[in-house]
Swiss-Prot record:
Residue positions binding Zn(2+) 2: 22, 25, 38, 41
Function per UniProt: May act as a bridging factor mediating the interaction between the R2TP/Prefoldin-like (R2TP/PFDL) complex and U5 small nuclear ribonucleoprotein (U5 snRNP). Required for the interaction of R2TP complex subunit RPAP3 and prefoldin-like subunit URI1 with U5 snRNP proteins EFTUD2 and PRPF8. May play a role in regulating the composition of the U5 snRNP complex.
Signal peptide range in chain numbering: none
Start and end residues of each stretch annotated as Disordered: 72-98
SUPFAM superfamilies to which the protein is assigned, alphabetical: HIT/MYND zinc finger-like
Phosphothreonine, modified sites: 161
Zinc finger (HIT-type): 7-41
GO molecular function: zinc ion binding
Organism: Homo sapiens
Keywords (A to Z) from UniProt: Acetylation, Metal-binding, Phosphoprotein, Zinc, Zinc-finger
Stated name of the protein: Zinc finger HIT domain-containing protein 2
Length: 403
């Protein structure tokens, strides 16, 4: 049944009867031309569905498939809005029937897009907030002047250059990082908390010297999760924090590390094991961004970025805890938030420790790159010998002849 009433988007004096309804807000319209003037609603709907899939495929595939199908047909259609997947009024069965109407090849292609973590390329580019006023050209100079540093080993890129990523086993990092982390406007820098308690007020005894090594692990998860969720969205707050706590053993499992390299490798292992999508940064890119955050804007305010990141984390975890229903989830979020507040107080009083941590992270970044290049070279050689990506079937070397 066609919707009753006039079109809500026709120019004054040219109002036509409405023949269709917007699938998102049910606004009446008469033609494809009028629907396109209402394009923001459709784009927002599409973005919500893609983000829903990125947060762990919790949204039913029928909703995202219908959005993709509708947008594709809309581009191909010029005159007949009915052919663009826009039915007259609510379609029988709603959106759930559109997934079944896709051909098997279309379903497989769409599922490959999600399984490879490439759906993020469909979203607008996003730029980390710590690139806004990064140290940039001074980065190498700071590392060179740091005690015990080896400038020949450390090659952190300028603040406006995408990370020099290599292929991980699970994703092609350079292309994804370049598209999602390109030179585009980014989010505003989070505000550093105005009241940071003294570390002695949060600890009953002496602070362990291993506390510092939890920072790289937490910041790795922070950079990875922000890039994966394109800066985060309150609608995805629960999933954002689930990814954060899943990648960071320091936040999610109260894990302790003996070195910065161990802390980074623990987080990288979670991604390499496939427990979470690699995201646009990948493991190398996330290590690179940890060093950037630890270096801050420069020597005059090196701890600023780390304080801002930890403060942002504490606020985010606090908001998620208020929304959580299950007691176990609330407890996990509470402990993670307390950990961030403790690291915030520690960082505020130990700014001098950030440069050595940044150096350790930069070395771990390069060591990971060397290993990745060696694996890629070995893989290429094996594929050359095999004549393809899989080894040939074993041949029988000795065969007993019948008597």
């Amino acid at each position: 049944m066609e919707p009753a009433g006039p079109c809500g988007f026709c120019p004054a004096g040219e109002v036509q009867p409405a023949r269709y309804t917007c699938p998102r807000c049910n606004a009446p319209y008469c033609s494809l031309r009028c629907y396109r003037t209402h394009g923001t609603c459709a784009e927002n709907f599409y973005r919500d569905q893609v983000l829903g899939e990125l947060r762990g495929c919790s949204a039913p595939p029928s909703r995202l498939a219908s959005a993709l199908r509708r947008l594709r047909q809309q581009r191909e259609t010029e005159d007949e809005p009915g052919e663009a997947g826009l039915s007259s009024g609510p379609a029988p069965g709603g959106l759930s029937g559109l997934w079944e109407r896709l051909a098997p090849g279309e379903k497989a292609a769409f599922e490959r897009l999600l399984s490879r973590g490439e759906a993020g390329r469909l979203l607008p580019p996003w730029r980390p907030w710590w690139w806004n006023r990064g140290a940039g050209p001074q980065l190498l100079e700071e590392l060179d002047n740091a005690p015990g540093s080896d400038a020949a080993e450390l090659e952190l890129a300028p603040a406006r250059t995408p990370p020099d990523s290599v292929k991980d086993a699970s994703a092609a990092e350079p292309a994804a990082a370049e598209r999602v982390l390109g030179d585009v406007p980014g989010a505003c820098t989070p505000v550093v908390p105005t009241r940071i308690p003294a570390i002695v007020s949060l600890s009953r005894g002496p602070v362990s010297p291993l506390v510092r090594f939890q920072l790289p692990n937490v910041l790795f998860a922070y950079a990875h999760t922000l890039a994966l969720y394109h800066g985060g969205d309150d609608a995805l707050l629960s999933d954002f924090c689930a990814t954060l706590l899943g990648v960071s053993g320091a936040l999610g499992a109260q894990q302790v590390f003996a070195s910065a390299e161990e802390a980074l490798q623990a987080a990288a292992h979670v991604l390499e094991a496939g427990e979470h999508p690699p995201g646009p940064l990948g493991t190398r890119g996330a290590m690179h961004e940890v060093a950037r955050i630890l270096l801050g804007e420069g020597p005059t305010n090196q701890k600023g970025y780390t304080l801002a990141a930890l403060g942002d984390l504490a606020q985010t975890l606090g908001r998620a805890r208020k929304q959580a229903v299950a007691r176990e989830e609330r407890d996990h979020l509470y402990r993670a938030r307390k950990k961030c507040q403790f690291l915030l107080a520690w960082t505020n009083e130990n700014e001098a420790a950030l440069t050595p941590l940044a150096l350790d992270c930069a070395r771990a970044h390069q060591a990971h790159a060397v290993v990745a290049e060696e694996v890629a070279a070995l893989t290429g050689e094996l594929e050359r010998l095999w004549g393809g990506p899989v080894p040939p079937a074993p041949r029988t070397l000795i065969e007993e002849l019948p008597s």
